[in-house]
A protein has these predicted regions:
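Non-catalytic interaction-recognition regions
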Residues: 2-117, 128-635
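Short, charged, solvent-exposed linker or helix-capping segments at domain edges/interfaces
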Residues: 117-123
Length: 635
């Protein structure tokens, strides 16, 4: 019989609410340890003791599950003696098994059964919907998935749903954020910078949702400018309505390349292009109609590619959406703010005292520039959405521009200027197909699919067992591209390597999918001899006290840490934080297969181990979904 008292322990008002929302299983144990520290040293408040609890090291260097450095509390007396006093006064509790002193540090070991039951119950409760729960009440991020397991327990026609909520929290409840990312230029290549912005931005949008924020995903297209005049002239000469309908992005690029080549020897092309763009800006019906057709059909194609990447947008905005009136208003405000000065006929803002150089806000010919449109666009967005934060996911090459943009908004007196944030990243070097040619993202995705398909075919027996090789190879290829991009710090440049990223060995995307597939197979391979009870009955039916091996404890502590990993990633905006966790969990599970065997074991032990593996699959799946990946169950 479990000694665990009613979950959770009594709330302590001074602890931030997000610690007590059942999103981090270890928090209740930290709270128990913090209350004990406070009981011995009343001058240390419970919330300070709580914040001082750090996860202990695993493996040979392990001292305990939690470690706290008493020196941080600035207590009177020698830290080593204080640590010994704390250890001497300890008596086991339903949550805490033992504590010990090591120099100025105190370490806590948790009650094994309480640890396993709390963590597994929480993963189970926050992952699986029971038949009694409201299936319509899922958050957007929950990423509802259907599972045939246990379908016979539900009303006819309804599959058991999964809410995949473990690791999420409500710290951002009531707040809204706009994440602007991807932002390709119509009729120009979807290059490596756009790829990184797309991958990292989609992850950040998911990360905000996982932390309780309402998220608006915005794609700010490069959809205005003289290049549309060139396109119009080119389309008149080389265009095909049929090709445009089939694949607007590729066809417009082909037209753009051809007409630009013609323009090298025929200056009249550029004159006609300028005339067309003037008509666009004047609102000419024919010019705007043709531009709109180019834009709309390009967005249709973009949506197909984004859907393939498991990425979507709530709003397709763009340079064209920032009205002339808004730009004029922004310029008037700039001039009225007293920060603008004239320089050789142009208007500038001198930001040298902020170490940001000078920035032009209007050219000497009177035309607007990017920063003016950005100012007008940001103001329009705030008026429309009243966001609490807006994040621009843009390459580090634009660091100066974004810093100038934010500073000018601040100097103009916009109170929301300090809610804008630039999340930057380094460049991809050598992104191309294996033949050395690539212009569009879709070409890279098609090539990665081909490569993974070739790798899969090398194992003929396994290949025959794959239900849909084309689907599987596509998802594996996309995973390979994304994980290669996200596994290092985002500010670092990286080299695009086919052989490395498509390998099933080492820290690669295919390896993560393989780990998930293997975890997904455990239930299938052990049925019907060992079958988990329905989610609502697991806690009462499974004896977790049988999970006594050190390897099982290593797995459960890693699963328990996932909510804290999500919070850490939110502080740094580093997808590598989640990637590293997913790799670590996959490695630990890989080393557990020979120790924590399910097949052929006594039924109760097999059931407990099966629940542990299924929980690991649920957590790894959540990490992959957070990274915008689609976990595979078979390959």
């Amino acid at each position: 019989m479990s000694l665990l008292p009613a979950f959770p322990l009594p709330e302590v008002p001074s602890i931030p609410a997000e610690h007590l929302e059942s999103t981090a299983a270890l928090d209740v144990f930290k709270l128990a340890a913090a209350e004990f520290v406070h009981s011995v040293f009343p001058e240390v408040t419970v919330d300070k003791a709580f914040e001082g609890m750090e996860s202990g090291k695993t493996g040979k260097q392990a001292l305990g599950d939690f470690v706290v450095a008493l020196a941080r509390f600035r207590l009177k007396g020698k830290p080593q003696e204080l640590a010994e006093k704390l250890a001497a006064e300890f008596k086991p509790t339903p949550y805490l098994a033992e504590i010990g002193a090591s120099g100025a540090f105190v370490y806590f070991n948790l009650q094994t059964e309480a640890l396993f039951r709390t963590v597994l119950d929480q993963i189970n409760t926050q992952t699986h919907l029971t038949p009694d729960e409201d299936h319509s009440a899922l958050s957007h991020f929950a990423n509802l998935s259907l599972d045939d397991a246990g379908a016979d327990k539900l009303p006819e026609g309804l599959s058991l749903a999964k809410k995949n909520g473990y690791g999420t929290n409500k710290s951002g409840k009531g707040k809204s954020v706009i994440v602007e990312f991807s932002s390709p230029n119509i009729a120009k290549p979807f290059h490596a910078g756009h790829l990184r912005s797309t991958i990292i931005g989609a992850f950040l949008a998911n990360l905000y949702e996982a932390n309780g924020w309402d998220v608006l995903r915005m794609n700010y297209l490069g959809d205005w400018g003289k290049q549309f005049g060139i396109l119009a002239v080119g389309f008149e000469r080389y265009g095909s309505e049929e090709e445009l309908e089939k694949d607007a992005i590729t066809h417009l690029y082909d037209v753009y390349v051809k007409i630009n080549k013609d323009g090298e020897t025929d200056e009249s092309i550029h004159d006609r292009a300028r005339e067309f763009f003037v008509k666009m800006e004047a609102g000419d019906e024919h010019a705007v109609g043709l531009w709109k057709k180019f834009r709309d059909l390009s967005i249709v194609k973009y949506k197909e590619t984004y859907a393939r990447l498991n990425i979507w947008f709530d709003v397709y905005s763009g340079e064209s959406q920032v009205s002339q009136e808004a730009q004029k208003h922004a310029l008037d405000q700039l001039q009225g703010s007293g920060i603008v000065e004239e320089s050789q006929g142009a208007l500038i803002v001198d930001l040298k005292k902020y170490k940001l150089e000078k920035t032009i806000v209007r050219k000497k010919d009177g035309t607007s520039v990017y920063i003016t449109r950005d100012i007008a666009g940001a103001a329009e967005r705030f008026d429309k959405y009243h966001f609490d934060k807006m994040v621009y996911v843009v390459a580090s090459q634009q660091d100066l521009h974004l810093a100038q943009f934010f500073k000018v908004l601040d100097l103009m007196g916009y109170p929301w200027a300090n809610t804008l944030q630039h999340v930057n990243f380094g460049m991809v070097q050598g992104m191309s197909t294996r033949k050395g040619t690539a212009v569009f993202l879709e070409q890279i995705l098609d090539e990665s699919k081909r490569v993974m398909h070739e790798v899969m075919q090398k194992n003929e027996e396994k290949y025959k067992a794959i239900e849909d090789p084309q689907y599987t190879s596509d998802k594996l290829g996309i995973t390979a591209v994304k994980v290669q991009d996200m596994s290092g710090k985002r500010i670092n440049n990286y080299e695009f390597k086919w052989e490395r990223m498509t390998s099933f060995e080492g820290d690669t995307g295919p390896y993560l999918q393989y780990a998930h597939v293997r975890l997904s197979s455990v239930e299938r391979k052990n049925a019907p001899a060992v079958v988990l009870p329905p989610p609502g009955e697991r806690s009462a039916a499974i004896n977790v006290a049988l999970l006594s091996e050190p390897k099982a404890r290593e797995v459960i502590l890693l699963l328990a840490s996932y909510p804290d990993v999500v919070k850490a990633a939110f502080k740094s905006f580093e997808p590598a934080t989640i990637c590293t966790y997913a790799f670590r969990l996959s490695h630990v599970i890989s080393s557990a297969w020979e120790t924590l065997i399910v097949k052929g074991q006594p039924h109760d032990l097999a059931l407990a181990r099966l629940w542990l593996y299924v929980s690991a699959k649920d957590v790894l799946g959540n990490a992959l979904r957070l990274l915008t990946l689609q976990p595979l169950d078979r390959m």
